[in-house]
């Protein structure tokens, strides 16, 4: 069911892949002698030097494959990829024919509203914070400061604040908003251009996008910190995943 201010958009290629993730499997075996089987993957697996090693793989001339984080191999409609977090290696399994992948049919997206392209001021405040991933694991994260801004409906002088990280010279933010009470995904991601020399930038909330976790709960996305949950609804950007 959609609302008058939203449309249904087909999945992008990236979102199709997000939906196909069936598992993030942490590999703690460290030698061929204690290699483990992984649900949805052939052969047996162990970790070595930050990579995962698969052995006894069918249709592989060497019978073995090494997948460092970001490496992947394709096996028909399935994909196997290396991953790591805090020095622990994992094997990610993707299957576009999985029930989860087939259940995702599109993304509900709010209509564009240029009123939600807002001016913002950046205040540098670099610090190390605790980041909580979707599976509850905590780890350190580096933030670079705050963006301060007003949104449509604010009273004169009212403002909001988001803590941001650096991403390739621009800003990245994981944020939640009060719209979650009306069906918007509990949190979304947003990229913001770097501030100019006077600290000015522009936030386009229309570009708010769903995290990979919205498509498959096998992802381990960073949750927004309490300070990044806005007390107003943000009725623009991607709203939620549509399923059968």
Regions found by a protein language model. Give the residues of each.
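N-terminal cleavable signal peptides for secretion/export
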Residues: 1-41
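C-terminal, non-catalytic interaction/recognition modules in large multi-subunit enzymes and RNPs
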Residues: 13, 28-29, 40, 106, ...
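Surface-exposed beta-loop interaction hotspot
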Residues: 78-148
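Broad, structure-driven detector of short, well-ordered beta-strand segments within folded domains
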Residues: 42-47, 77-84, 159-164
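Long, compositionally biased interface segments
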Residues: 193-244
């Amino acid at each position: 069911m959609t609302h008058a201010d939203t449309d249904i958009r087909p999945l992008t290629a990236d979102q199709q892949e997000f939906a196909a993730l069936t598992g993030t499997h942490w590999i703690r075996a460290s030698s061929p002698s204690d290699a483990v089987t992984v649900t949805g993957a052939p052969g047996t697996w162990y970790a070595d030097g930050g990579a995962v090693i698969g052995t006894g793989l069918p249709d592989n001339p060497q019978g073995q494959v090494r997948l460092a984080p970001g490496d992947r191999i394709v096996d028909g409609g399935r994909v196997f990829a290396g991953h790591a977090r805090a020095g622990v290696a994992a094997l990610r399994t993707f299957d576009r024919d999985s029930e989860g992948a087939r259940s995702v049919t599109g993304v509900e997206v709010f209509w564009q509203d240029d009123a939600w392209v807002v001016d913002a001021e950046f205040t540098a405040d670099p610090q190390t914070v605790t980041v909580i991933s979707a599976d509850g694991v905590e780890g350190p994260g580096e933030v670079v400061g705050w963006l301060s801004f007003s949104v449509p409906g604010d009273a004169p002088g009212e403002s909001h604040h988001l803590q941001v990280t650096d991403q390739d010279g621009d800003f990245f933010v994981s944020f939640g908003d009060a719209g979650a009470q009306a069906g918007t995904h509990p949190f979304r991601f947003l990229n913001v251009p770097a501030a100019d020399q006077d600290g000015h930038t522009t936030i386009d909330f229309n570009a708010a996008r769903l995290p990979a976790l919205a498509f498959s709960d096998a992802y381990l996305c960073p949750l927004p910190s309490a300070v990044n949950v806005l007390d107003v609804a943000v009725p623009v950007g991607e709203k939620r995943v549509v399923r059968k």
